[in-house]
């Protein structure tokens, strides 16, 4: 077998491979003989079909089958010979060959890049330190009450925090406009879902009331044709509801897994959960800083095959989480995910290099500790631990998570650390605000 290798970029390789004709013809002949022993054809006894007839009917198909297999086998052998690590599948370009000529083809493929990481001591990380005070616990309990609240019909005039069910119709210069009307829209006063003045205009209304609101769309409104426009909204209220909070009692505590010990035990459990949430949020912010700075220290070309694979994973994940079974992953534009996919692939390659360079690993003790940390938020933690430890696939996923943590801790130990004291509320905030997402609102007045 003859092999010649050409580098067409830092990560793309073009390999020309030649396989002797005798090797190809020998395998073709062997398979045709095997076919002749089993093939059934009208006018011939089984196993007695002349080879000339077998070749005429099956020769070309068998030859193409052999060529395909030999290209794959020769490609793998050539990779081993050249000590190459491909990233993704190759593109084969067979040259036209006639009977008796050597098989020659070109395999174009990408290899994993060489990842060189800069000085880890140049990385600087801000790490937050927090303290949970009693007021934080009380505030969390109030949030839990809000989450467990129920809407009850109210005959009172609508006030801040009430939910109204309304019909409304928007007009500009006496003409209705697209997205300016809705039926049975539910609006919570104070939610700031609607344009300025809309929710304030609902205060004091009761079920059955009607009102016209004269409002102005903001100059920075997302719809270009509505910016700064004066509009009238005819509103009819069909229902006013008020939020009813649950009492703080044993029944409320039981909803959150506290069966005994009363309010004191409940507050202890809430504080533990808050501490776990804050530690997780802080660790995630440290990881984000480490990742961002590692990316800045490492410049290399990313194999498109790996990016495409990550895009497909992200598409599938998006469909599972948001698609509701109504769409296919292929319907989502790849460009929506490409930038994030590139970042994920680069991060994975950098982390893998740090692991390799420093002989890092995730120990059994670390994996079990991570599983127990995760399980502690469930009502039956030991069952969760047992499930992970007895499920090889899930345990392997957890091993990957732990190994990422090991890399982050290793890099952070080399980095300059600045500790900053923050409140619980600041501790659980993300490092950067997520990008605003366009909403499929019920109306343009939102």
Swiss-Prot record:
Record-annotated disulphide pairs: none
Residue ranges annotated for the PPIase FKBP-type domain, each copy included: 161-246
Catalysis: reaction(s): [protein]-peptidylproline (omega=180) = [protein]-peptidylproline (omega=0)
Comp. bias intervals (Acidic residues): 437-446
InterPro entries: PPIase_dom_sf, PPIase_FKBP_dom, Trig_fac, Trigger_fac_C, Trigger_fac_C_sf, Trigger_fac_ribosome-bd_bac, Trigger_fac_ribosome-bd_sf, Trigger_fact/SurA_dom_sf
Keywords: Cell cycle, Cell division, Chaperone, Cytoplasm, Isomerase, Rotamase
Protein name as it appears in the record: Trigger factor
Isomerase found in the keyword field: yes
Record lineage: Bacteria, Pseudomonadati, Pseudomonadota, Gammaproteobacteria, Oceanospirillales
